[in-house]
Swiss-Prot record:
Pathway: Cofactor biosynthesis; ubiquinone biosynthesis. This is Probable chorismate pyruvate-lyase. Its EC number is 4.1.3.40. The lineage of its organism: Bacteria, Pseudomonadati, Pseudomonadota, Gammaproteobacteria, Chromatiales. GO terms for molecular function: chorismate lyase activity.
Amino acid sequence: MREHAAWQPQAAAWRPGVAVVPGRPAPAVQRLLTERGSLTARLERLGPVRVHVLREAWQRPAPDEGVALELPVGRHAWLREVVLDCEGGPTIYARSIVPDRLLGPLARLPRLGERPLGRLLFSAADVQRGPLAVARLRGREPLVRWLRGHGLPSPAGGWARRSTLSVAGRRLLVTEVFFPEGVEGER
């Protein structure tokens, strides 16, 4: 897996990596935040992973997501929001934004249903992850509002990460929120 540098996180809440974030996470959380490979595969080593789809639709991404993907303002992208429940491990909210036509392995994205996106992405030989950005959630971020809109508990005090990935020449943005009460048990 090679890295690409198409996006460098610039927003105040997102920091480039765990080392520069105030209030270091617990070691178990830090291991998840810095995972460069498939987070799904890591979770599946802990136990079965269940995917609960919250929303899948074409819509305009949030402004900072559009910037991260270098999208023109107002352009639509495929949005997928899910909750990953890992038996014996953490609970994670994941938000994926895929612009453009869905070609190659990403063409199956709208039909994934309750299968993890990570399996699809990391089965591709040419997957590339951009820089990881990390945020400590304080409760005012758009991510927290989205979670509340889905009736999920507030992740305030928890951690989030995001990065761009490139598969078959198509870039997407994946944001993952680690619920505070669900991460401490991760080994």
